Structure formats: C-alpha cells, structure tokens
Amino acid sequence: MATKKAGGSTRNGRDSEAKRLGVKRFGGESVLAGSIIVRQRGTKFHAGSNVGMGRDHTLFATADGKVKFEVKGEKSRKYVSIVTE
C-alpha cells in the first residue's frame, strides 16, 4: 500500500502587488496640464515650476509644455519642471 507522510504547512507564499511607481514622462517629452510625470513614495523628485504634488507625492503637470529634470540646490535635489513654449 503506497503511503506518504503528511507534508508540513508553510508560512510563505505571499507577495504584494506591484505599485507601478516610477517616471511616466521623461525629459523633453511634451505633456498636457494634469498629466502624471512621476509616481513615487516620498519625495525622490521635487516639484519645480508648473508642477504640482498630490497627497501621495505624485508629481503632475499644471501647464502644457515640455518636461525638464534638473539637479538644484545645496542638497543636490532632483527637481521636475515644465517648460512652457
């Protein structure tokens, strides 16, 4: 008679869903007002001119134009701006 000892239970086997974070519009790309530029946790990128920040730190365009990434300030922070034509 074929028998098999009962397997032990495991406490693994779970993983969280991907949150789809990151840069959505890159430097030089044209955007319309309201377009999401960066989805992030915390302020990896800071809002520059013509860019707003949502309550989950999402950066979005407040005017039509081209995306510009720049490093500014004493602390070398990364800023995202929209350059209007």
Swiss-Prot record:
Gene3D superfamilies assigned: 2.40.50.100
NCBIfam families assigned to the protein according to its UniProt record, in alphabetical order: L27
HAMAP family: Ribosomal_bL27
SUPFAM superfamilies, alphabetized: Ribosomal L27 protein-like
Record bears the keyword RNA-binding: no
Listed name of the protein: Large ribosomal subunit protein bL27
Superkingdom of origin: Bacteria
Pfam families, per database record: Ribosomal_L27
Signal peptide: none
Keywords (A to Z) from UniProt: Ribonucleoprotein, Ribosomal protein
One GO CC term, this protein: cytosolic large ribosomal subunit
GO BP, sorted A to Z: translation
Region (Disordered): 1-20
GO molecular function: structural constituent of ribosome
Sequence similarity: Belongs to the bacterial ribosomal protein bL27 family.
